[in-house]
Amino acid sequence: MSRIGKKPVAIPAGVNVTIEGNVVTVKGPKGQLSRELHKDIIVTVEGNTVQVTRPSDDKFHRSLHGLSRTLVANMVDGVSVGFSKSLELVGVGYRAAKQGKKLVLTVGYSHPVEIEPGEGLEVEVPAPTKIIVKGIDKEKVGALAANIRAVREPEPYKGKGIKYETEVIRRKVGKTGGKKGKK
């Protein structure tokens, strides 16, 4: 058995899980998510837990087992608690602002960069150098945070750019100035 796949997913109070064929739908206080899982994976609701099982010990089924369980667990967490990712802007004059729903980044280009968060996503700017992406779908939250970071990735010499709050930038030593090679 998969170590992750065999663990049951606890359903908190206020969350409802329904299964129709191979489509799992999770409703909770923050919203609703549904996802189609592979046809071979068996998902059952037993009391206040969701159990994910596989039909055989094939390598393919083993790999899907843990994945499917984690996807269901992320759906349950998303509709009950939600997910968030924090980003920081490092650099002189680098700042973020919110215009309506859009996020406007000033990060050293000749023009401000506008990013529209997708449906079900929310962007907060508590400070000009801090961005928080929130939502119920972990995949979408991570993808939007990665897209924001990709606008100006941190460079290794001064560390300027947009980075995740917990990310540590590996620094490089710059060239040493001097009269190397001069006669």
Swiss-Prot record:
GO cellular component terms listed in the entry, alphabetical order: cytosolic large ribosomal subunit
A biological-process GO annotation: cytoplasmic translation
InterPro entries registered for this protein in UniProt: Ribosomal_uL6-like, Ribosomal_uL6-like_a/b-dom_sf, Ribosomal_uL6_a/b-dom, Ribosomal_uL6_bac-type, Ribosomal_uL6_CS
Matching Pfam families: Ribosomal_L6
Gene3D superfamilies to which the protein is assigned, alphabetical: Ribosomal protein L6, alpha-beta domain (3.90.930.12)
SUPFAM superfamilies according to UniProt: Ribosomal protein L6 (SSF56053)
GO molecular function list: rRNA binding; structural constituent of ribosome
PROSITE patterns in the cross-refs: RIBOSOMAL_L6_1
Keywords: Ribonucleoprotein, Ribosomal protein, RNA-binding, rRNA-binding
Function: This protein binds to the 23S rRNA, and is important in its secondary structure. It is located near the subunit interface in the base of the L7/L12 stalk, and near the tRNA binding site of the peptidyltransferase center.
Annotated family: Belongs to the universal ribosomal protein uL6 family.
Quaternary data: Part of the 50S ribosomal subunit.
Protein name: Large ribosomal subunit protein uL6
Source organism: Heliobacterium modesticaldum (strain ATCC 51547 / Ice1)
Gene (name only): rplF
